[in-house]
Structure formats: structure tokens, C-alpha cells
Amino acid sequence: MERAEILGVGTELLYGETLDTNTAEIARSLKPYALKVERTLRVADEVAPLAREVEEAFARARLVVLSGGLGPTPDDVTREAVALALGEPLELDEAVLGEIEAFFRARGRAMPEANRKQAMRIPSATWLKNPRGTAPGWWVRKGGKDLVLLPGPPPEWRPMW
């Protein structure tokens, strides 16, 4: 049976300010598949420690799922950490930036500059469209392994998963 690991990203998870229900729900969703969830972990919103955990998890497991840290705030560093762990640069995707701008326009608002970072991805990532928010996810396949990045809010990641 192949291994899976799930990382809940967010300092608020470590301090109990937010209850990490995502990890358990994602783990339960993997039960019907030939994947054994071997490890779950909560990691702070810090690039270097998160990159290290991603690199180690990706070395051990066939599937690594990260939940959280894809928002527009300075502490949302999952993209940067995964780019560092996989040794790939972050690049702006103009089409996705346009979708995020359209999300705000549809609500009668201009997109804040901070949301621009949500349109950044590494070259090996495929976008997972977020029908309910501005944080798209990623699906990365490398060396026969998969890495999935999902936003933290359950109403956003569930339709993507």
C-alpha cells in the first residue's frame, strides 16, 4: 500500500486558535483508495521549516496534501515553501490573475494588491480552480508522486478535492 502524508499549515493550528478539522477529513477521504495515511502534521507559517517538512514528506510518501497558507496575507507562505522544497521558481500566471480580478469585480470591488501572490505557481504545478474563493490550489506530479495544495477554509477546498 502506498503512503500519504497530510500537512496542516498555519501557526493558528499549532496554538489551538483554529481547530484542524481539514487533516482528519482529508485522511478519511483517502480510505477508499490504496493509500495509507502514515503521517499528519501541523506546521507553522514559516517558509524554511515548512519547506523542510514538504521535502521530507515528498521523499517518503506517494501523495502529500497541504491544507492552508494559500491566502493573500504575508503569513500565507505555502507557495513559497513548496517552490523552495521542489527547487522551482514561482511565476505569475496572468490568466489566473485575471480570474482573481474578475472575482473581485463581480463583487463590485477592486482586487487588493496582496491577492496578486495567489496567481503565482511553480512551472510543474497545475491549477486547481477554486469556485468559492480567490486561493486556487495546485496539483504537482513529479517522479511518479503527487503533491496537492489546498486552501484552508473547508468550503473552498472541498469542491477542489
Where are these regions (language model features)?
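An anion/phosphate-binding loop that grips the pyrophosphate of nucleotide cofactors and donors
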Residues: A61
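Structural motif
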Residues: A44-E55
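Glycine-rich phosphate/diphosphate-binding loop of Rossmann-like nucleotide-binding domains
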Residues: M1-L41, D45
